[in-house]
């Protein structure tokens, strides 16, 4: 096992070194392409452009700033020989460009010369406008390449710094674990780790059994085993326990006890919830019975009202006299002060109806509405606890 771990570490280190070398070569190639002949070419183009623009653009600008006006030299056409003034014919008209007008020249030739001069002037103007734009673009490209090369150099320095830190950490780990410990100590540590893994697997199995509820854990037996191990040094050596492992086992025992207490509390809460559900179901049944009784009373009243509606209206007074005791019997069932007031109001209305001889249908409707209101009030009352 230790040999395999050492080999794996060596492989990882070699892979890291290869990656670093590849990155460094890539950066070097990119930087070399930017900082080599390309920079020289850009500088040469800038110098040529400046030399071409100086006499036509920069020199007149400098002279204008300094306050000197450069007079243009008279241009002489080299194709034609100079003509004597006496050959021109007295005080005739002169050419606007400083040339004497020749009568022997055809007008078409004069037009062609004027067009050629205009085209040459236009081409020169375009050339003078395009060259400064080109120089500005080249300068911007040069600045961009310079800044880019500086940024890459800074990134490369950061990478080298982090790589050096990783190398130092690897060397420290080697000195801590590889240099100090020998093979025997490593084997002993591996055996102890295996023993702790076995103990953990057993504890997990016991926890699963506790959750299932089939095989509860015997904590007394675990305490006895711990005491025996503390007393017998030979048993400790055989099992390979250390102080850290003993503390770990004690912590696990405490956790098991807490788990049992939590499971008991959970069972108690379950029982309480079941009892509450039973009590709530009983209360609901009582409420349903009360509602059924009220519905039966309302159905009886509706039947009585239908029978009264079938009787003729002439016997209105007699029906009212027969209806009074039934109304009084229903209203006596009410216990609150509001119900007593309603009975008084109903009695007064009945007396008024007897005196005036009003129909009974209106009174029956009012009575049905009152019963509905009473039913709603009973439902809104708080439940008995």
From Swiss-Prot:
One GO cellular-component annotation of the UniProt record comes to:
endoplasmic reticulum membrane
Please name the Pfam families in this protein's record. RIC3
* Provenance organism: Caenorhabditis briggsae
* Entry's transmembrane regions: 39-59, 127-147
Q: Subcellular localization, per the record?
A: Endoplasmic reticulum membrane
* Biological process annotations from GO: positive regulation of synaptic transmission, cholinergic; protein localization to cell surface; regulation of muscle contraction; synaptic transmission, cholinergic
What is this entry's stated membrane topology?
A: Multi-pass membrane protein
**Positions of the UniProt region annotated as Disordered:** 1-31, 72-105, 157-176, 269-385
Which residue stretches does the UniProt record annotate as biased composition, category Basic residues? Answer: 375-385
What are the Basic and acidic residues biased-composition ranges?
A: 1-13, 362-374
Family to which this protein belongs: Belongs to the ric-3 family.
As for what it does, the entry says: Required for maturation and cell surface expression of acetylcholine receptors.
According to the UniProt entry, which residue ranges have a biased composition of type Acidic residues? 163-172, 281-310, 352-361
Q: Which residues form a coiled coil?
A: none
On subunit structure and binding partners, the annotation says: Interacts with the deg-3/des-2 acetylcholine receptor.
Q: What InterPro entries does the entry give?
A: Ric3, RIC3_N
Write out the ranges of the annotated region (Sufficient for function in acetylcholine receptor folding). 32-152
Spell out the molecular function terms from Gene Ontology: protein folding chaperone
Q: Which named protein is this? A: Resistance to inhibitors of cholinesterase protein 3
The alphabetical list of record keywords is: Endoplasmic reticulum, Membrane, Transmembrane, Transmembrane helix
């Amino acid at each position: 096992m230790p040999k395999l771990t050492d080999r794996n570490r060596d492989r990882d280190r070699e892979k890291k070194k290869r990656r670093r070398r590849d990155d460094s070569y890539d950066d070097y190639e990119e930087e070399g392409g930017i900082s080599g002949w390309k920079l020289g070419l850009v500088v040469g183009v800038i110098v040529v452009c400046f030399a071409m623009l100086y006499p036509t653009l920069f020199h007149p600008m400098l002279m204008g700033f300094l306050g000197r006006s450069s007079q243009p030299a008279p241009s002489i056409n080299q194709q034609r020989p100079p003509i004597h003034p006496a050959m021109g014919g007295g005080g005739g008209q002169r050419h606007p460009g400083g040339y004497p007008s020749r009568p022997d020249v055809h007008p078409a030739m004069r037009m062609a010369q004027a067009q050629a001069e205009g085209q040459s002037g236009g081409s020169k103007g375009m050339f003078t406008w395009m060259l400064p734009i080109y120089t500005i673009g080249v300068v911007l490209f040069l600045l961009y390449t310079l800044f880019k090369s500086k940024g890459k150099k800074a990134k490369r320095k950061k990478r080298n710094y982090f790589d050096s830190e990783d190398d130092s950490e690897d060397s420290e780990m080697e000195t801590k674990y590889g240099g100090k410990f020998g093979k025997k100590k490593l084997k002993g540590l591996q055996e102890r780790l295996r023993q702790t893994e076995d103990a953990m697997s057993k504890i997990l199995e016991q926890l699963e059994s506790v959750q299932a509820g089939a095989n509860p854990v015997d904590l007394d037996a675990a305490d006895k085993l711990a005491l025996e191990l503390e007393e017998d040094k030979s048993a400790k050596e055989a099992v390979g326990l250390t102080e850290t492992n003993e503390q770990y086992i004690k912590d696990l025992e405490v956790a098991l006890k807490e788990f049992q207490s939590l499971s008991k509390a959970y069972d108690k809460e379950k029982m309480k919830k079941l009892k509450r559900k039973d009590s709530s179901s009983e209360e609901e049944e009582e409420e349903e019975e009360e509602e059924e009784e009220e519905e039966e009373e309302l159905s009886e009243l509706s039947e009585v009202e239908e029978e009264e509606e079938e009787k003729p209206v002439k016997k209105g007074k007699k029906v009212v006299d027969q209806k009074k005791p039934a109304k009084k019997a229903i209203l006596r069932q009410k216990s609150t002060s509001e119900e007593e007031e309603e009975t008084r109001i109903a009695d007064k209305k009945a007396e008024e109806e007897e005196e005036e001889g009003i129909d009974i249908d209106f009174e029956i409707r009012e009575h049905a509405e009152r019963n509905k209101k009473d039913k709603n009030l009973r439902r809104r009352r708080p439940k008995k606890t």
